[in-house]
Amino acid sequence: VIKVRNQERAEAFYNGILKLPIAARLPSKSMTFFTLGNHHDFAILAVGDDAPDAHPDSPGLLHVAFKIGHLLDELREAKRHLEAAGIEVIARDHVVSKSIYCNDPDGNTVELYVDASDVWKLQPEAVAQTAPLDL
């Protein structure tokens, strides 16, 4: 569950742009649950338009990540889709995965990724690497 300011605006991003199917909507609790195959894998909780931004150095969630496939072409298509919607995207090569990052309407960072290989099974330290990725 991540906190957002506005339920409808967040739904428009996560369902409308990222295409996460809605599993349940609870307007009375300002919550929406999204499915990735299970009943609910991800949820938003609206805390109000006046809620302050989380401080970047405070403890808490750094970002959420969603695996979108296995192929680099799937990541390229996701990048094109986000950019066509006016969303700024950063691409990164993590050796074990290839990723793009963007922010939701409330500044929460979202990672979309494809697995690059099984290198992490042989080199666990490879998981912490980051380099620019040209898509």
Each language-model region and where it sits:
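Short beta-strand/turn micro-motifs at beta-sheet edges
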Residues: 49-55
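Short glycine/proline-enriched turns and hinge-like loops at secondary-structure junctions
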Residues: 27, 56-58
